[in-house]
Design a protein with these regions (language model features):
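Residue-level marker for buried hydrophobic side chains located in beta-strands
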Residues: 7, 34-36, 68-69, 149, ...
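A general structural motif
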Residues: 2, 29-32, 63-65, 146, ...
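Acidic, His/Gly-enriched loop-helix segments that form or flank divalent-metal centers
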Residues: 110-224, 228-233
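Active-site neighborhood of divalent metal-dependent phosphoester bond hydrolases
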Residues: 43-140, 177
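Divalent metal-coordination and catalytic microenvironments
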Residues: 10, 39, 54, 71-72, ...
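N-terminal active-site segment of His-dependent metallophosphoesterases
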Residues: 1-53, 59
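Active-site environment of divalent metal-dependent phosphoester hydrolases
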Residues: 12-16, 42-45, 73-78, 157, ...
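Short acidic-glycine loop/turn motifs at beta-strand connectors
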Residues: 145-147, 239-244
Length: 249
């Protein structure tokens, strides 16, 4: 029997969705692997709670291997903390105010704008505890097992060839890349990724419930598990090799 791997889509601060989806998993054993695809923070109301669960509780609850990948939103906050990146924190759509409010234990309304004080605080990231920044900085860019390659956003193409993550000179590209050529044209070992919400991918190219454009997207050799958690959608966990899904909805 092949070892089981469970890939958790982008959580984006939705602690309730994460708890609901995890509660639907079958009992895990020491041979299983639980992989979180990154983007733990921003947009949803409980980024601090998600980070606490992933950092402290899941290592105790998961009997097998736990892999927490780095997402582009973790990369964004690391850049903010190391010198500032206003282009990341200012756009309302990035949901950075929700993260600040979460770590301050304060609520946030949808599309609410930050105060002047909050905007200054966000631009420096000083509200993030050092231990959280250190944790984000230690998150790996990718993982691979017998079933698939797991990476937050996708693979990088160079000279007409899709590079294995180990060949990518700048690993941050693995967190931010977004090109339809990858989803439509990649052929090779299966890749599981998040980052691009499935509602933005062509449903007719998905072999998994193409009638539901919000559902997990399964192409020829690419599977996308970002089903909109924290931004009006739900959270999906994919079990490999069985291709079973467990959803928060």
């Amino acid at each position: 029997m092949a070892f089981r791997t469970f890939a958790v889509g982008d959580v984006h601060g939705d602690l309730a969705a994460l708890e609901r989806a995890l509660a639907k998993l079958p009992p895990l054993d020491a041979k299983d692997t639980l992989i979180l695809m990154g983007d733990y923070v921003d947009r949803g109301p409980h980024s601090a709670g998600v980070v606490e669960l992933v950092r402290r509780e899941l290592p105790r609850r998961v009997p097998g291997k736990l892999v927490c990948l780095r997402g582009n939103h973790e990369d964004g906050w690391l850049r903010v903390a190391s010198g500032g990146w206003p282009e990341f924190v200012i756009p309302v759509a990035n949901g950075c105010l929700a993260t600040l409010r979460s770590f301050r234990d304060q609520p946030v309304k949808e599309n609410e704008l930050p105060t002047r004080e909050e905007l200054v605080t966000m631009q420096h990231g000083e509200f993030l505890p050092d231990e959280i920044v250190d944790w984000m900085n230690a998150l790996p860019y990718w993982y691979e097992d017998e079933h698939a390659i797991y990476v937050h956003a996708g693979l990088v193409e160079k000279d007409g060839r899709w590079l294995h993550p180990s060949e990518t000179e700048n690993p941050t590209q693995l967190l931010w890349v977004r090109t339809m050529r990858f989803f439509e044209g990649y052929r090779g070992k299966r890749v599981v990724c998040g980052h691009t919400a499935t509602e933005n991918l062509p449903p007719e190219l998905s072999s998994f419930t193409p009638e539901d454009p919000l559902d997990m997207w399964v192409g020829e050799d690419v599977i996308v598990v970002d089903t909109g958690s924290g931004k009006g959608g739900f959270l999906t966990i994919l079990e490999l090799p069985a291709m079973k899904t467990y959803e928060s909805r």
